[in-house]
């Protein structure tokens, strides 16, 4: 359901006749201006579970909230230290992306690669897990095969060993598991992604001007 209200809202109340027959997926209270962002956090997910969301439900979401851009960022927990073969992951994520395309036909889709993830070698040195680099190659292929945009977050972070640099930054921008960024790190990477998107838009506008 969608309700439009003019002016300021002080409070909102919903009343249902039977609680057992009512299911709330969420609440959005957006204005008519600016950028609207919905964040669907699926912690620990590889992104393959998106295939299981019924098409009818997603299409109903699209009727109420027709997205311009869908950003996918999964895979950190898929990577293993020496992982080389991610064929099943590639096949599954391609299916998930096609599923989203069918349900949100107007939306562009951007796939973010996994970031750096470090481990300690036998000599005690911090190095990027080889499996991370292999997974990123698979993710690049996924984006190319499905015809969607791709952003290499690993390279944006600084490439090889960059997670350790974020951990040891002052103040720190990542956790001492050398896997997860913190809020400061998230803000830092968000700024880099924003700059990339704006630069891409500027280049697109310049090309269009010469057509």
Residue ranges and their predicted role:
Residues 40, 72-73, 112, 135, ...:
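Generic beta-strand/beta-sheet core signal
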Residues 88-91, 95-102, 134-141:
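Alpha-helical scaffolding segments of alpha/beta enzyme cores, especially the outer helices
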Residues 1-92, 180:
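Conserved SGNH/GDSL esterase-like catalytic core that processes O-acyl groups on lipids
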Residues 69-75, 94-102, 108-113, 117:
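Conserved, well-ordered alpha-helix/loop/beta-strand core segments that scaffold catalytic motifs
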Residues 35-36, 65-70, 104-109, 145-149:
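Loop/turn elements at helix/coil->beta-strand transitions in domains of secreted/extracellular proteins
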Residues 59-61, 99-100, 196:
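A generic secondary-structure signal
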Residues 55, 116-211:
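Catalytic His-Asp segment of secreted/periplasmic serine-dependent ester chemistry enzymes
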């Amino acid at each position: 359901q969608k309700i439009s209200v003019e002016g300021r809202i002080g409070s909102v109340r919903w009343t249902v006749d039977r609680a057992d027959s009512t299911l709330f997926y969420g609440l959005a209270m957006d204005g008519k201006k600016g950028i609207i962002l919905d964040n669907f956090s699926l912690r620990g997910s590889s992104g393959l579970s998106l295939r299981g969301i019924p098409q009818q439900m997603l299409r109903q979401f699209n009727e109420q909230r027709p997205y311009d851009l869908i950003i996918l960022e999964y895979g950190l927990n898929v990577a293993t230290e020496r992982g080389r073969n991610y064929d099943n992951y590639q096949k599954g994520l391609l299916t998930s992306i096609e599923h989203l395309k069918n349900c949100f036909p107007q939306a562009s889709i951007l796939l973010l690669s996994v970031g750096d993830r470090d481990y300690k070698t036998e000599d005690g040195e911090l190095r990027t897990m080889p499996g991370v680099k292999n997974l990123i190659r698979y993710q690049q292929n996924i984006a190319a095969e499905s015809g969607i945009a791709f952003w290499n977050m690993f390279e944006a972070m600084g490439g090889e060993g960059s997670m350790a640099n974020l951990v040891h930054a002052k103040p720190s921008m990542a956790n001492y598991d050398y896997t997860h960024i913190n809020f400061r790190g998230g803000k830092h990477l968000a700024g880099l992604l924003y700059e990339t998107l704006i630069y891409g838009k500027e280049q697109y506008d310049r090309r269009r001007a010469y057509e």
